[in-house]
């Protein structure tokens, strides 16, 4: 009783330091051998001595590829084609083009991304003086631009003789007119050895839309575009390759022999990274494909998966992956855990796989179960270098598909690649079932509410992540990981009542706006 009175009066000198320890460190938490989801966990706030704008979200996608924002769009046929991939890269992340299509269709999608934003365009579309205005019209319809250099041969490397832009062609009715009659021949050019900064300076001063780059013989070797100056100004976080300053883009493929032909075509198109798209990545097929890619296409990074255990990680790391994709049966449209009785709660899977893979400097992508900004922050806190989003981005203007209305709501279709609908189109390769007479679905088809454009939605996510890291007292993704593994960031397990308390409650009605 005397001890209790001392505590109540604040005079007790026998306080024990362990009484004041808040929460668990990550190792204590996951030694309990429970399977945790993101919602099961909460992180405790840290000390703030910097602004949210000072938070750096620069991170690794693979061993060799960096992103300016830890966001990746999923290779699903209702999520990522060229529009999504372009905008994800402009905003600092990356898009992975799905492969529920023909090789030719996937290659076209990749090329559209790589052509969208360039430093020096080393493979510009070129025409000859004998081509017609109708040829320019076809190029504009297919690629969306009409500023075309003209060489005597109609190919890169030919002698530059002119350039054709919309100013030369807009008001000419006869589209059979040859380009020699309308092209501009009084040209301002850059020399082959000029830097990108010098080329941009010339574009600014001459107020032209295109700047042909020529060698000492006057032969066309490259092209610089004024449009790209504007894009650099409007999208300073854009993720680009180091060599040509083109937007980064990834593509998915399978592990069949026919996928080697797809890989060759994707390599020619300039893809930066490929994801081996399988619901269960620890297979002989995937290990062999990883070795094939690293042996024959050393400049292309390969991400393996999906995995959820350390033994799966070990298997693919030994095969030579540059990154891993973690998650099995946790997506909103995925039924793998329910149907196959196989998978793992995502928070536990991310922590275990990230901790193991960190020994080999192999980054992981937390794939699935992302419904809120909080889930993104938790995935990063548990060791993921980036997060992959499907349902979060489905329903945006840039996602494939058309909007439709139901019960007054504007919706877009969203389906799992393991749904019967997607399997019929080709997604069954992902589930090793393309030869099965009876298909067993591991996903569903549904719809999601219109979210507007990713040009507004993704910056909202990025700002939210920055504020979340600020609350934890971490000024970068790297600092976050160090603080988690060092025990500075503390965790607690939330009871069911705590989860209710931590979400919207006790209201008759409310509205929830993303932006």
UniProtKB/Swiss-Prot annotation:
It comes from the Eukaryota. Disulfide bonds: none annotated. Signal peptide: none annotated. Residues 120-179, 183-239 form the CBS domain. The active site is at 334 (thioimidate intermediate), 430 (proton acceptor). Its EC number is 1.1.1.205. Its cofactor is K(+). The keyword Oxidoreductase applies. Pathway: Purine metabolism; XMP biosynthesis via de novo pathway; XMP from IMP: step 1/1. Keywords: CBS domain, Cytoplasm, GMP biosynthesis, Metal-binding, NAD, Oxidoreductase, Potassium, Purine biosynthesis, Repeat. It is found in: Cytoplasm. It is an enzyme of class 1 (oxidoreductase). Mycophenolic acid (MPA) is a non-competitive inhibitor that prevents formation of the closed enzyme conformation by binding to the same site as the amobile flap. In contrast, mizoribine monophosphate (MZP) is a competitive inhibitor that induces the closed conformation. MPA is a potent inhibitor of mammalian IMPDHs but a poor inhibitor of the bacterial enzymes. MZP is a more potent inhibitor of bacterial IMPDH. InterPro entries: Aldolase_TIM (IPR013785), CBS_dom (IPR000644), CBS_dom_sf (IPR046342), IMP_DH (IPR005990), IMP_DH/GMP_Rdtase_CS (IPR015875), IMP_DH_GMPRt (IPR001093). IMP binds at residues 332, 367-369, 390-391, 414-418, 442. It catalyses: IMP + NAD(+) + H2O = XMP + NADH + H(+). One of its GO terms (molecular function) is nucleotide binding. The keyword Chloroplast does not apply. GO terms for cellular component: cytoplasm; phagocytic vesicle. GO terms for biological process: GMP biosynthetic process; GTP biosynthetic process. Homotetramer. PANTHER family: INOSINE-5'-MONOPHOSPHATE DEHYDROGENASE, INOSINE-5-MONOPHOSPHATE DEHYDROGENASE RELATED. This is Inosine-5'-monophosphate dehydrogenase.
């Amino acid at each position: 009783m005397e001890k209790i009175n001392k505590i109540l009066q604040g005079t007790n000198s026998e306080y024990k330091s362990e009484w004041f320890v808040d929460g668990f460190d990550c190792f204590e938490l996951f030694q309990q051998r429970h399977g945790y989801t993101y919602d099961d966990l909460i992180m405790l706030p840290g000390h703030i001595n910097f602004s949210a704008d000072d938070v750096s979200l620069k991170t690794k996608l693979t061993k060799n590829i960096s992103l300016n924002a830890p966001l990746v769009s999923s290779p699903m046929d209702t999520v990522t084609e060229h529009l999504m991939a372009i905008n994800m890269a402009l905003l600092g992340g990356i898009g992975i083009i799905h492969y529920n299509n023909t090789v030719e269709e996937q290659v076209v999608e990749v090329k559209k991304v790589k052509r969208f934003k360039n430093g020096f365009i080393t493979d510009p579309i070129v025409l000859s003086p004998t081509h017609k205005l109708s040829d320019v019209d076809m190029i504009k319809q297919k690629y969306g631009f009409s500023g075309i250099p003209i060489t005597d041969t109609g190919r890169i490397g030919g002698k530059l003789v002119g350039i054709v832009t919309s100013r030369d062609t807009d008001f000419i009715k006869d589209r059979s007119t040859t380009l020699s009659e309308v092209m501009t021949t009084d040209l301002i050019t850059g020399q082959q050895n000029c830097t990108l900064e010098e080329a941009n300076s010339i574009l600014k001063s001459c107020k032209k839309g295109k700047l042909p780059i020529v060698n000492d013989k006057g032969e066309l070797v490259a092209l610089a575009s004024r449009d790209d100056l504007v894009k650099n100004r409007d999208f300073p976080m854009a993720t680009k390759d180091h060599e040509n300053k083109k937007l980064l883009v990834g593509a998915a493929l399978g592990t069949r022999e026919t996928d080697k032909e797809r890989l060759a075509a994707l390599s020619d198109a300039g893809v930066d990274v490929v994801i081996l798209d399988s619901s269960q990545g620890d297979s002989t097929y995937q290990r062999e494909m990883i070795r094939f890619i690293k042996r024959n296409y050393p400049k292309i990074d390969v991400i393996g998966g999906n995995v959820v255990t350390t033994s799966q990680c070990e298997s693919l790391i030994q095969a030579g992956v540059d990154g891993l994709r973690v998650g099995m049966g946790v997506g909103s449209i995925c039924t793998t855990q329910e149907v196959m009785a196989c998978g793992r709660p995502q928070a536990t899977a991310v922590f275990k796989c990230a901790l193991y893979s960190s020994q080999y400097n192999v980054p992981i992508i937390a794939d699935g179960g992302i419904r809120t900004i909080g889930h993104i922050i938790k995935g990063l806190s548990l060791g993921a270098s980036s997060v992959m989003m499907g349902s979060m981005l489905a329903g945006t203007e840039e996602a494939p598909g058309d909007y439709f209305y139901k019960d007054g709501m504007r919706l877009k279709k969203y389906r799992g690649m393991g749904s019967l609908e997607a399997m019929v189109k080709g997604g069954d390769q992902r589930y090793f079932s393309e030869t099965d007479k009876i298909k067993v679905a591991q996903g569903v088809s549904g719809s999601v509410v219109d979210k507007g454009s990713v040009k507004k939605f993704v910056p909202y996510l990025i700002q939210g992540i920055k504020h979340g890291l600020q609350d934890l007292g971490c000024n970068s993704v790297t600092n976050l990981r160090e603080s988690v593994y060092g025990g500075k960031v503390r965790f607690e397990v939330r009871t069911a009542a705590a989860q209710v308390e931590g979400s919207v409650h006790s209201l008759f009605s409310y509205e929830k706006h993303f932006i």
